[in-house]
From Swiss-Prot:
Keyword set includes Glycoprotein: yes
Any one annotated GO CC term: extracellular region
Designated name of the protein: Fibroblast growth factor 5
Annotated glycosylation sites: 108
Localization of this protein: Secreted
Protein species of origin: Mus musculus (Mouse)
Gene3D superfamilies for the chain: 2.80.10.50
SMART domains: FGF
């Protein structure tokens, strides 16, 4: 009788523990939890408010990837800073002049560099560039009559073909204007006084120094890269000890005998 009673108590204990374990599993998954005391209402409200605040705080974070994506799409349509070169164009004609672009549309050269001579050269297509004055914020252009001027808007007149010469100078020819009969290109040029020459002039040729410009750009400081090169060296032969050389013996000076003749 005692064994059967103990067996029943053991089975009831197992059933009770299994039921309690199953209830704990169901509660975190959204199943209705056992009823709580009315005094815990304030705690539940506090927890609900904390949950709402955390969800509201996480909402801008979720929205941030969209904003970042729109920014990346917008930045893809902008000019790449690596495609722009800022500096000056130095023409070696006469005493040497820096190309200048004025806010009023005038273009000429000055021997001394100034803020008007700071230019920005950017690529438009393969071999075609545009030149903009940083201070005047206007583009270098050549009219259909070959006259150089500054334009507030970037048009086809502002496109120039950049070529590199063998003497490390560059030439800039209009991309659309040229002589119709001969097909001769019109180049950007300055005379000996620093005034802009007409590109249609027959004297403006790519071989003349008036069309040669030396780009002077500011190079960004790059960190110095150092490395060590090891060259295999041949083993030097062991140094032999110096043996003092024996001085040659001096031969004794010959003895001279004088013959004496005696006559009886």
């Amino acid at each position: 009788m005692s064994l059967s009673l103990l067996f029943l108590i053991f089975c009831s204990h197992l059933i009770h523990s299994a039921w309690a374990h199953g209830e704990k599993r169901l509660t975190p998954e959204g199943q209705p939890a056992p009823p709580r005391n009315p005094g815990d209402s304030s705690g539940s409200r506090g927890r609900s408010s904390a949950t709402f605040s955390s969800s509201s705080a996480s909402s801008p974070v979720a929205a941030s990837p969209g904003s970042q994506g729109s920014g990346s799409e917008h930045s893809s349509f902008q000019w790449s800073p690596s495609g722009r070169r800022t500096g000056s164009l130095y023409c070696r004609v006469g005493i040497g002049f820096h190309l200048q672009i004025y806010p009023d549309g005038k273009v000429n050269g000055s021997h001394e560099a100034s803020v008007l001579s700071i230019l920005e050269i950017f690529a438009v297509s393969q071999g075609i560039v545009g030149i903009r004055g940083v201070f005047s914020n206007k583009f270098l252009a050549m009219s259909k009559k070959g006259k150089l001027h500054a334009s507030a808007k970037f048009t086809d007149d502002c496109k120039f073909r950049e070529r590199f010469q063998e003497n490390s100078y560059n030439t800039y020819a209009s991309a659309i204007h040229r002589t119709e009969k001969t097909g001769r290109e019109w180049y950007v040029a300055l005379n000996k006084r620093g005034k802009a020459k007409r590109g249609c002039s027959p004297r403006v040729k790519p071989q003349h120094v008036s069309t040669h410009f030396l780009p002077r750009f500011k190079q960004s400081e790059q960190p110095e890269l150092s490395f060590t090169v090891t060259v295999p060296e041949k083993k030097k032969p062991p140094v032999k000890p110096k043996v003092p050389l024996s001085q040659p013996r001096r031969s004794p000076s010959p003895v001279k005998y004088r013959l004496k003749f005696r006559f009886g």
